[in-house]
């Protein structure tokens, strides 16, 4: 580790700031004070990582989505689900490219609320640091990803509509015409209590999807 930044982190502004000393190589981006917060809670568990070979120009992108917080408690005590894909931009994986591009657009929108000055080469100095170069390379890699309009991404979020409202229409392009009678849910925590009734959220999903 030589002071470079390899990973940036965006958390809800109510979260305690994580210092680079506590986690070398990680930059916990600060929330802008002059921006309008357009969400009640930033609570997505999504990572978009790029990897490059040391001795060649070969690169690939990894998208990770999980149901649990990325903490030691989740790792050691909870039962959670993780979904991930690896995509080489030049390959003919149209579905994978649609997924990573949808996630990239999501991150770009969220980035507007955070201070990224340390990552960009926007000053008067002509010197570019390792961090500037890596950040520019990250965005350039996604600029080269082209997706056909007919391909529907499997990655989606609730910036414009609730997940419950979107789910029925988004599931259809990725399922067969045969009707299904099975629904699997994977949240980090489940509704409890003494009632024998089906929880309201699960019942709503059941009525809309099955």
Model-found features: residue ranges?
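PLD/PLD-like phosphodiesterase catalytic module centered on the HKD motif
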Residues: 1-210
């Amino acid at each position: 580790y030589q002071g470079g930044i390899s990973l940036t982190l965006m958390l809800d502004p109510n979260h305690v700031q994580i210092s680079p000393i506590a986690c070398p190589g990680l930059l916990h981006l600060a929330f802008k004070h002059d921006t309008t917060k357009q969400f009640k809670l930033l609570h997505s568990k999504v990572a978009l990582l790029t990897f490059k070979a040391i001795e060649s120009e070969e690169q690939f992108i990894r998208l990770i989505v999980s149901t649990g917080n990325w903490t030691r408690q989740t790792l050691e005590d909870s039962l959670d689900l993780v979904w991930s894909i690896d995509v080489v931009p030049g390959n003919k994986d149209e579905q994978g490219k649609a997924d990573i591009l949808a996630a990239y657009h999501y991150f770009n929108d969220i980035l507007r609320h955070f201070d990224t000055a340390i990552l960009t080469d926007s000053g008067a100095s002509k010197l570019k640091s390792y961090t500037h170069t890596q950040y520019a390379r990250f965005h350039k890699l996604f600029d080269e990803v082209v997706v056909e309009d007919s391909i529907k991404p499997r990655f989606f979020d609730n910036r414009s509509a609730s997940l419950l409202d979107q789910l029925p229409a988004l599931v259809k392009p990725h399922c067969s015409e045969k009707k299904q009678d099975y629904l699997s849910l994977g949240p980090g925590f489940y509704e409890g209590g003494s009632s024998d009734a089906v929880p309201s959220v699960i019942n709503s999903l059941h009525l809309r999807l099955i």
